[in-house]
């Protein structure tokens, strides 16, 4: 079974488990979810690298002061403690928190644990960071959970 099929099968099982009608990657290898109208998560299959990337939108870059970047860099220095790291998406203007799962480790249990860890940290950082006034743009994308 190719990796796209494996991920789509896993996402369908996950969708059924949490009560969604369906969930699968689009033709570009992406899927989006929105949790509690607060945290947008994009799933991106990097087939050539044999991994699934999870990206959680945390805040708008423009609402952050310079001091926060030191905290984010400090968190990244210890990425191995949480298997997460921060980055910036200049196209969307978002600070994002990233996790990845190697194809060899991709099971439903691993996916759910990684997603839960990502959501816990994203929600924690959202409480610490200034409020992002552009939540409507996130709400318009993906499947609501």
Curated annotation (Swiss-Prot):
Q: Name one GO biological process term.
A: protein secretion by the type III secretion system
What Pfam families does the record tag this protein with? CesT (PF05932)
GO cellular component assignments: cytoplasm
Instruction: Relay the activity regulation note.
Output: In the absence of inducing signals, ExsE interacts with and inhibits ExsC activity.
Keywords from UniProt, A to Z, are: Cytoplasm
Query: Which subcellular locations apply to this protein?
Result: Cytoplasm
Mutant phenotype after disruption:
Deletion mutant results in a two to three-fold reduction in extracellular exoenzyme S activity representing the efficiency of type III secretion system (T3SS). Mutant also demonstrates a lag in the induction of cytotoxicity towards Chinese hamster ovary cells and is attenuated for virulence in a mouse pneumonia model.
Q: Does the keyword Cytoplasm apply?
A: yes
Q: What is the first-listed, main subcellular location in coarse terms? A: cytoplasm
Its function, per the record, reads: Part of the regulatory cascade that plays a role in the transcriptional regulation of the type III secretion system (T3SS). Interacts with antiactivator ExsD to inhibit its activity leading to ExsA-mediated transcription.
Subunit description: Homodimer. Interacts with ExsE. Interacts directly with ExsD to form a heterotetrameric complex.
What is the recorded name of this protein?
Transcriptional anti-antiactivator ExsC
């Amino acid at each position: 079974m190719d990796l796209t099929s494996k991920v789509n099968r896993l996402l369908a099982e996950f969708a059924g488990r949490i009560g969604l009608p369906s969930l699968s990657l689009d033709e570009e290898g992406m899927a989006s979810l929105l949790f509690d109208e607060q945290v947008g998560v994009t799933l991106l299959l990097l087939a050539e690298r044999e991994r699934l990337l999870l990206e959680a939108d945390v805040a708008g870059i423009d609402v952050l002061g310079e001091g926060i970047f030191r905290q984010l860099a400090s968190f990244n220095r210890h990425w191995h403690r949480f298997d997460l790291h921060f980055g910036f998406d200049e196209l969307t203007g978002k600070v994002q928190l990233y996790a990845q799962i190697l194809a060899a480790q991709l099971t439903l249990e691993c996916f759910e644990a990684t997603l839960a860890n990502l959501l816990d940290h994203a929600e924690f950082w959202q409480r610490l960071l200034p409020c992002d006034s552009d939540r409507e743009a996130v709400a318009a994308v993906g499947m609501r959970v």
